[in-house]
Amino acid sequence: MLAIEQAAQAHPWTRGHFASALAAGNCLLGLMAGERLLGYLVAMPGVQEAHLLNLAVAPESQGQGLAGVLLRALALWARGQGAACVWLEARASNERALRAYRRCGFAQAGLRRGYYPGANNQREDAIVMRLDL
């Protein structure tokens, strides 16, 4: 998982990020092909909602709709937890992710200015998206 995270993310989570997220009781969903991990997501349950914290697909498996498979699995899990919606934030510059989220029914619900750290001590906006279940 860490290898995919490092290869797929511009600002990857560390082992500590994953450990903290899982210790807090968050959900980890993995997409496997045999013994090979193709992608994963981490989501946080909430009161009648869920929040996508991280999603990555191995670079060699990107462009095959696997993010959509993971997002549909997330929606099923969230419904099972009693959620009415799923929230996420994505970097404004991450057009590929934003397209994938829109294809899966997410709609922009807001903007968080300067939410993410960026290059050269700059900050990057986050697009807040919501999927009603």
What are these regions (language model features)?
Residues 57, 91-92:
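Short amphipathic helical patch at the helix-1/turn junction of helix-turn-helix
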Residues 87-89, 107-124:
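Conserved catalytic-core motifs of GNAT/GCN5-like acyltransferases
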Residues 121-133:
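Terminal substrate-recognition subdomain of acyl/acetyltransferases
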Residues 78-89, 100:
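Conserved GNAT acetyl-CoA-binding A-motif
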Residues 101, 106, 129:
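Conserved active-site tyrosine of GNAT-family acetyltransferases
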Residues 71, 94-97, 114-120:
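Short glycine/proline-centered loop/turn elements that form peptide/ligand docking sites
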